[in-house]
Amino acid sequence: MQSFIFFVFLIYGFFPHCQSINDGNIKINLPNQQDVIYRYTRSERGDPAEKEGSVFKLRTTVFFVVYGLLVLLAFIAFLVWRLRRSKTQEKRKNMALMNIYSDLRDTGDAMPEELKNRPLNDKLDYLPYKKQYEIASENLENKSILGSGNFGVVRKGILKMASPKNEEEKKMRLTVAVKSAANCYDISQTSMLAAELRLMCSIGRFPNVLALVGAVTSELRKGRLLIVTEYIDCGDIRKYLIDHRNVFQDHLIEDKTEPDSYLTPISAKRKNYVFKNTDENSDYVIKESLDSLTTSDLLSFGLQIANGMQYLASIPMVHRDLALRNVLLKKNKTIRIADFGMARTHENKSYYIPQKTKDAPVPVRWMSPEAFDTMKFTEKSDVWSFGICLYEIFTLGQLPYPDVPSERIYEYMHSGRRCPQPQHCHVELYDLMKLCWHEKPELRPNFSNCVEYFIGHMKKSASKLLENVDEMLRVEAENQRKLEDWIRVERSESV
């Protein structure tokens, strides 16, 4: 009531000289108090429909205003949450990268005695990063992508010499392969890459093993870790064999000097090497042209893989995924065993996911039975895989067990069945394959035995080829030694 009286006096004060207001058929004289009261009462008793409409509009307006404010507040709250979450994740990421960087730079804790004779794979946490492999980022230029997978990207790179001694060396450039994480924000990928780097540092350099040139670790705290290796220009051997099947020259033919007998089955007739080159000095010699493919090349590939695996086993180190797709080929037909890192793409159709591993694809066509059973890998399981590699070589890249589905490989192996003798394979080498595929691991040869077997076989049948391979590997060892000159900060004048 007091508010109403105040309202009346307010109007009276604002309109002291007004005479009348014409509101429809009602004439109201102001500032007569009675008239003002009458108008107020008339307004309150107005049309109910109009009053209801006004109330509805008011409620609608209030609803949308309140709803809008709530949405705005919710959006602001969401932004604040995202910002805090992002900062928390960024902080955790930076701490994780710092830990990886510190672990990589740390000389490492003393290795437990029980691990000292174990393969490198079992003691990754204790393997140091050797600082002499560090490459200044300004000396490395990344180029086109060579390949990529779920965990890593490999690019072609150009490396400048760290300490050139003259103008000629300043102009020199080395083509390299540069591996990085597929997603630099994924800590697990960076961690696996760091583990692979420590592994490669400990492996060292050997002619038939992909050599580490160096690494860029200075920007690891920003999520950037680069592994720099030799650039191998011709891809993997399996693809090369498949692509050159139509030009293959088979020098392994049936031996006509052996007496024919109806008691000797056709499948048992022996084949020997007959090299058809007319130039005596060119017999057994590997042609560096990639356009040619002969039996000599197949023998050379087999020996070189055995040679590289013998070196890895001597470290010791277990490969776990030895297959021709992981053996690279240079233009001069020397090979490099590669892909012994922790990160695997598993995009190859020859991989199969067994029930035991649930979601971890494994190369069942190359795996030994005991590795399939226990998921534990040893030199002897690698030897089994080497036998499969020989099968791939002498079938010119054919898939092992081509008629057996991946999910039935385990059953097939345990039944005692094995891959048949390839058409282009000497019987002595097939005997080696069967030894590699012995059901009992302890009865399989080791890689030193495999190298000796190969050398003995080639001495009898292709001695000049053996000399040729030895010379190629000597040159490759020297080329790998020179890789140090590209990253060494201080070089003597005699270098």
From Swiss-Prot:
Q: Which InterPro entries match?
A: Kinase-like_dom_sf (IPR011009), Prot_kinase_dom (IPR000719), Protein_kinase_ATP_BS (IPR017441), RTK (IPR050122), Ser-Thr/Tyr_kinase_cat_dom (IPR001245), Tyr_kinase_AS (IPR008266), Tyr_kinase_cat_dom (IPR020635)
The annotated topology with respect to the bilayer is: Single-pass membrane protein
Can you provide one Gene Ontology molecular function annotated for this UniProt record? transmembrane receptor protein tyrosine kinase activity
Q: What is its main location?
A: membrane
Q: Name one Pfam family in it.
A: PK_Tyr_Ser-Thr
**SMART domains attached here?**
TyrKc
For ATP, which residues are the binding ones?
146-154, 179
Membrane side Cytoplasmic: residue ranges:
82-495
Q: Which reaction does it catalyse?
A: L-tyrosyl-[protein] + ATP = O-phospho-L-tyrosyl-[protein] + ADP + H(+)
Active-site residues, as the UniProt record annotates them: 321 (proton acceptor)
Give the Extracellular compartment stretches of this protein. Answer: 23-60
Keywords recorded for this protein, A-Z: ATP-binding, Cell membrane, Kinase, Membrane, Nucleotide-binding, Receptor, Signal, Transferase, Transmembrane, Transmembrane helix, Tyrosine-protein kinase
**Annotated signal sequence range:** 1-22
Q: Give start and end of each Protein kinase domain.
A: 140-455
| EC numbers, comma separated | 2.7.10.1
Q: Which one GO biological process term can you cite for this protein? A: cell surface receptor protein tyrosine kinase signaling pathway
A cellular-component GO term for this protein: receptor complex
Q: Which family does it belong to?
A: Belongs to the protein kinase superfamily. Tyr protein kinase family.
Task: Sum up the protein's function in the record's words.
Answer: May be specifically involved in cell-cell interactions regulating cell fusions that generate the hypodermis during postembryonic development. It has a role in the development of the HYP7 hypodermal syncytium.
Write the protein's name: Receptor-like tyrosine-protein kinase kin-16
Q: Which organism is it from?
A: Caenorhabditis elegans
Query: What's the encoding gene here?
Result: kin-16
